[in-house]
UniProtKB/Swiss-Prot annotation:
Mn(2+) 2 binds at D144, D418, D516. The modification N6-acetyllysine is found at K202. One of its GO terms (biological process) is peptidyl-threonine dephosphorylation. It comes from Homo sapiens. It is linked to Pyruvate dehydrogenase phosphatase deficiency: Results in lactic acidosis leading to neurological dysfunction. This is [Pyruvate dehydrogenase [acetyl-transferring]]-phosphatase 1, mitochondrial. Heterodimer of a catalytic (PDP1) and a regulatory (PDPR) subunit. Coiled coil: none annotated. Its cofactor is Mn(2+); Mg(2+).
């Protein structure tokens, strides 16, 4: 691999190709695909399209996959023990603390915690975090894949490079291009902060690098170097749109390498939403495409917590999105463009990367499939044309960008895929994280809501909490603590170990019926530094 390619796309470690590129089940709640996929209870009345039924191949004898686990058991019940639960919850957790200089942290970010809990096998969510080295700021993002993990994997590897390049001044772009031309080593533009299980595709790194290079060459040609001001919002939008365009173009052109040729097609025909935050001092930008969310945790003067939404879901619950779609297509399609709260009756998010089945013309789809590998040509999903498909594209990857200037009371930011937001209210998310970060969790009164609780039940709740007073400290990661509550909370808002154990014991075919993949990043802000910015004005 050429040196410049290696510098831009570091190889974390060799990965299991079967885990990354093996046959993926094209089954996800984002697509109305089959009855065994995860579909929220309120949407179960919708009938799947027959063409999707062939993509769900539940493993036979699922019980065999549990034989390696040890269970605490009763004659009829099998529960994971608390240590086993912790092992599952903490398997994918990652924490990063911003390094100090001379004993001081001069960044507006103290650090972040992240974690993932799969429901699909393999998990279709991805996450990324990186520090921009040639400019200022940090990038953090969550990516929710559907119809497989190929697109979310590619976007998680590539999007931050496109954003970083979009933020670079003209002279830096020229320096990078000259270094590549002359074969000289160049400084990396990103410092990645990744869990050991997060990976880069070494097979596709050269292809990805060449597409990125073409992008910065075009930026050099477009920019004469006269203007030094870079609009972060515009850079984010351009990066999202350009990456999606490259994903589409790579699939159309193909690759002489059969492995890469199949890979780029899988990336293009699957899809992914993205929610990305760029933090530079007190300037916070959130770019969102799809239905993942960014939530700001604000601590009020009385110590209470409030949630400030920094992103909008791009789905049928968003009236502006519905109006946008209807305006982009003829009036004759007003009743068909969104059916049963889904794009063309099939796709839940109205914005996403990939998903070329909702972007390409029918002729282009047929031409690419017919000239593609046998695995693609034999796949009923790729050959299926959505109903009422008259005026593509119906889908865009253009993000909606929100700006927020940080204040001392802004304590943290939660980025999470919809697997979290479908199980917890935003205010509960912020309260749980806030109490965790301030160590106040065990001091809060037990909330029983409108339930009638007997004295014996209350005694049981108090006893349970007393034995678990250290639970807040048994989780050293805020994202892990949040997942524990998202999966294990009972009607009283406390973690029920029996419920948590049951949910984590479900085989993958059942897990998807109860919840989605969950990916969370919790970013903690440095109130002292943020306050200093404010005082300088």
């Amino acid at each position: 691999m050429p040196a410049p390619t290696q510098l831009f796309f570091p190889l974390i470690r060799n990965c299991e190709l079967s885990r990354i590129y093996g046959t993926a089940c094209y089954c996800h709640h984002k697509h109305l695909c089959c009855s065994s996929s995860y579909i929220p209870q309120s949407r179960l009345r919708y009938t799947p399209h027959p063409a999707y039924a062939t993509f769900c191949r539940p493993k036979e004898n699922w019980w065999q996959y549990t034989q390696g686990r040890r269970y605490a058991s009763t004659p009829q019940k099998f529960y994971l023990t608390p240590p086993q639960v912790n092992s599952i919850l903490k398997a994918n957790e990652y924490s990063f603390k911003v390094p100090e200089f001379d004993g001081k942290n001069v960044s507006s970010i103290l650090g972040f915690d992240s974690n993932q809990l799969p429901a699909n096998a393999p998990i279709e969510d991805r996450r990324s975090a990186a520090t921009c080295l040639q400019t200022r700021g940090m990038l953090l993002g969550v990516f929710d894949g559907h119809a497989g993990c190929a697109c979310s994997q590619a976007v998680s590897e590539r999007l931050f490079y496109y954003i970083a390049v979009s933020l670079l001044p003209h002279e830096t772009l020229l320096e990078i291009e000259n270094a590549v031309e002359s074969g000289r080593a160049l400084l990396p533009i990103l410092q990645w902060h990744k869990h050991p299980n997060d990976y880069f595709s070494k097979e596709a790194s050269k292809l990805y690098f060449n597409s990125l290079r073409t992008y910065w060459q075009e930026l050099i040609d477009l920019n004469t170097g006269e203007s030094t001001d870079i609009d972060v919002k515009e850079a984010l939008i351009n990066a999202f749109k350009r990456l999606d365009n490259d994903i589409s173009l790579e699939a159309q052109v193909g690759d002489p390498n059969s492995f890469l040729n199949y890979l780029v097609l899988r990336v293009a025909f699957s899809g992914a939403t993205a929610c990305v935050a760029h933090v530079d001092g007190v300037d916070l930008h959130v770019a969102n495409t799809g239905d993942s969310r960014a939530m700001l945790g604000v601590q009020e003067e009385d110590g209470s917590w409030s949630a400030v939404t920094l992103s909008n879901d791009h789905n049928a619950q968003n009236e502006r999105e519905l109006e946008r779609l209807k305006l982009e297509h003829p009036k004759s399609e007003a009743k068909s463009v969104v059916k049963q709260d889904r794009l063309l009756g099939l796709l839940m998010p109205f914005r996403a990367f990939g998903d070329v089945k909702f972007k390409w013309s029918i002729d282009l789809q047929k031409r690419v499939i017919e000239s593609g590998p046998d695995q693609l040509n034999d796949n009923e999903y790729t050959k299926f044309i959505p109903p009422n498909y008259h005026t593509p594209p119906y889908l865009t990857a253009e993000p909606e960008v929100t700006y927020h200037r940080l204040r001392p009371q802004d304590k943290f930011l939660v980025l999470a895929t919809d697997g979290l937001w479908e199980t917890m209210h935003r205010q509960d998310v912020v309260r749980i994280v806030g109490e965790y970060l301030t160590g106040m969790h065990h001091q809060q009164p037990i909330a029983v809501g409108g339930y009638k609780v007997t004295l014996g039940q209350m005694h049981g709740l108090l006893t349970e909490r007393r034995t678990k007073m250290s639970s807040v400290f048994e989780d050293q990661n805020a994202a892990t603590h949040l997942i524990r509550h998202a999966v294990g909370n009972n009607e009283f808002g406390t973690v029920d170990h029996e419920r948590l154990s049951k949910m984590l014991s479900l085989p993958e075919e059942l897990a998807r019926m109860y919840r989605d993949d969950i990916t969370i990043i919790v970013v903690q802000f440095n109130s002292h530094v943020v306050g200093a910015y404010q005082n300088q004005e």
